[in-house]
């Protein structure tokens, strides 16, 4: 991996994998992503997207009817891609406070809830699930005020704690923060949750295609310093 730039993909390994995997089911079994926080198999509906932002857009659009006229309550420490996803889904939002130790300020969250609030969006930061006292309170607040819960596991993709994780109505995350890949995201919908059926959008636009191309060529140019690099540079 190249920190601060594009990932490097090993073409030979990719081709070798393609030759050894005979069908899609075998590929899913060998290389499919497991939702580690889903200890009790409550999320049978999972969609893999091109990035975490797209995953969030799908989730917000899935509950658009339920959220009509409502706002999403966000932590005041988050990636701007979440705001971008909300704007893409034409959703309104407010904020609650995050403590210095990256736990949720429950008092701030509770005070921020109004009759216009329709969803709590929260994040497990840096692989550490939010404390049980916090997640228990989130569940109570959601039940009391009839709120949806969206759980962002981008930073805790491999964490597992059935009492503190895996209880949101939606789970979203960016997989590329952990895997050596150019991009990737996941959205999971809790079993039994009704929502609007959505067609899958074309996941890769021109910029993502260029990223994939650059990542594929990087190793070659790193190991062949005399090769003509103009094609690579033109697409960087």
Describe every region a protein language model picked out.
Residues 26-30, 72-74, 146-154:
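Short, hydrophobic beta-strand segments that form beta-sheet elements in well-ordered domains
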Residues 180-236:
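Conserved core segment of the aminotransferase class I/II
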Residues 61-115:
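Conserved PLP-anchoring active-site segment centered on the Schiff-base-forming lysine
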Residues 32-37, 77-80, 153-161:
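Short, polar loop motifs at secondary-structure junctions
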Residues 39-42, 85-88, 159-167, 221-230, ...:
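Short loop/helix-cap segments at secondary-structure boundaries that form the rim of catalytic
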Residues 102-197, 206-207:
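Active-site phosphate-binding strand-loop segment of PLP-dependent enzymes
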